[in-house]
Swiss-Prot record:
Catalytically driven reaction(s): GTP + H2O = GDP + phosphate + H(+)
Similarity field: Belongs to the small GTPase superfamily. Ras family.
Record's protein name: Ras protein let-60
Membrane topology designation: Lipid-anchor
Amino acid sequence: MTEYKLVVVGDGGVGKSALTIQLIQNHFVEEYDPTIEDSYRKQVVIDGETCLLDILDTAGQEEYSAMRDQYMRTGEGFLLVFAVNEAKSFENVANYREQIRRVKDSDDVPMVLVGNKCDLSSRSVDFRTVSETAKGYGIPNVDTSAKTRMGVDEAFYTLVREIRKHRERHDNNKPQKKKKCQIM
């Protein structure tokens, strides 16, 4: 079974834990309880392949920013989560993206831009801006609502597909070992 190490990043209060718990337990967490760091595992079937998702739900609070480099090193793919009703959380996505690219020392890191809280009527980040930003980054974007479960599976599954593409690109770039044969 293939394992995928997914990391959920974003500002505090954007719904990272709510999205993760909705995926894992099919349950919406109403109250806000700031996360320091939680890890979840779930077996799912994506495109006919059984996968084990190892999901790290991270702290959004600034006081835990020192921990970020460590989990960014170990993660294979990242959900960049912001709240559609909070423009500042969208602006801060660029900082998370840059930090991931710096820590990974690569421009080619699987990521998905996730606009959460789409069930709320007070959207301050319009869909076109999100779409254009994602296109500029060269990554997919998914609108979600942890409350209604809209787009939750799609966000995580899209990230797994991005990791698969990344693995294929990098496996194809590895030089093939030549077998040596001696005839005596």
